[in-house]
Amino acid sequence: MSSESDTTIVEAIDEVLAWSSLFGDHMDAESVLRNLQVKGSINSILQAIESSPHLSIENDVVYSDKHDRNLNIKYSQELASKHFKETMEVLSILKSCEQITGLALTGSVAAGMNKDDGDVDVMIITKPGWVWRVRALAIYLSHEHPTGQLLCPNMVLSEDSLRFEKTVYTAREMMQIIPIKDSKGITKLYDENGWVKEILPNAQKKPSRPLSKHGDYPWWWRVMKIPLLGQIIESWEARRRIKQLKLTSTSNEALYSKSICRGHENSHKTRIEAEYQNVLEAIL
């Protein structure tokens, strides 16, 4: 007979697996713990699974009879690893940039899965006054560098504009990121969003992914760093890009300002939250 505590943990696990089913993902016990919205431990998860008729664990992966198994997950995981390796050189250039104080993998690759046509999404945190020049560098590398074609710098933020809205979606996305560089930028991100621990009390920042070398910058990057001229270019690039992006934007999730370039044009958050509610209602 299950205890009230076991029942609570089972319900919390059900919620996590409903979430992961939206992405075709299967989580190990540690990932389930990271995503639980109640305080728990690996032992409490294992005990709850043992007490539940619909939960099981195989090779440390937690399954539920309420959701289909993704038979292609190994291939998706191999793609994530492959795409990251293909992008390592261009990421190492960004990592070496002094104006970037935080760099992290986000999205599917950070979750450990990707599609054949998937990108490598990254979050870039810059020193104040550098968002649009750094974005220009990242976009240039994604288009012109031999290893940059998968790079998708869809979020470039100034380190003085790191507060996010308080939602389950945002909390999970934030705790899913894999840091590549943290010269106080990623640390500030978590400090500014301390509410994440209220939603995900067991979550810890993922360890950094090491990158050892870096390549050359385009010649014009030296011009961007000239003090007065660089500031003029930053203002000019910000004005023209913000105007251009706002004119073409079709998503209420996208945000463009002098200190934020959040190009979430596919309304991913809105769609996932709607699907999430439908899945939750179906299993209750």
PLM region descriptions:
Residues 4-50, 56-102, 106-117, 126-284:
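Catalytic core of pol beta-like nucleotidyltransferases
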